[in-house]
Amino acid sequence: MWSKAAPAVLVLLGSCRAQPSEPHFPSAHRDVAPIVGGVFSTEDARDRMGEAEQVMQLAGVKPGMSVADVGAGEGYYTVRLARVVGAKGRVLAEDIVPEVRDSLSERVQRENLDNVAVKLGAADNPMLPAQSFDRVFLVHMYHEVQSPYAFLWHLREGLKPDGLVAVVDSDRPVQRHGIPARQLKCEFAALGMDPVKFSMLTGGDAYYMAFRLARPRPAPDTIQACGA
């Protein structure tokens, strides 16, 4: 018969078991921009340029879709995506800064966005539920990702088989808070994703590029870093 100490013994034995090691990913082999905050520009300025409307049209966002806004910040895209996908659609807004996540949660509640969920992710893993999203948006944030290969390796699992990753960034050096389109294409290709659409956005140097799943997810130790 087990004594009263038995549960503690079981816990101790369990803790002694070898834990699976974290997969090893290649480093970026390029500059990574520092995180400068959750606001890229004022919402009024972005609305005047029609940025969100351009991007959502290019991405083919429709009512009833499930979409993720990764690196959502203060929620400029989150609230606009919520309106387009409607009551039958879903938006997951993710950020890695707890205070930003909390502020966005308050906004979602204040604006009664019942089709939006807010969650905290990690710098190298947005922690998206598997095969859940028609579109995953990365808007003016990818150049700040410290471990792009780990990030994309995890992120691609959140896509439905016919889903797309929609990236918006500026066509300029990473040091100036952008990423050249050629570099972006190379890094996505390393994770088995190919571009399906590219367009320069009006009103600045920002571009839109969408990617689909083209090949199986590679093992982390087989990923070939761009520029390595």
Regions found by a protein language model. Name each.
Residues R17-A68, Y76, E106:
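Class I SAM-dependent transferase core
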Residues A82-R83, Y149-L164:
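A short glycine-rich, Lys/Arg-flanked "PGG" loop and its adjoining helix->strand segment in the class I
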Residues D134-P148:
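A short SAM/SAH-binding and catalytic strip from SAM-dependent methyltransferases
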Residues P63-G64, A87-K88, L159-V165:
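Short glycine-dipeptide loop
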Residues A68, G73-P126:
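Class I SAM-dependent methyltransferase SAM/SAH-binding core
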Residues S199-A228:
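Core SAM-dependent methyltransferase catalytic element
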Residues L164-E187:
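Conserved class I S-adenosyl-L-methionine
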Residues D124-V136:
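A short acidic, Gly/Pro-enriched loop at the edge of an enzyme's catalytic core
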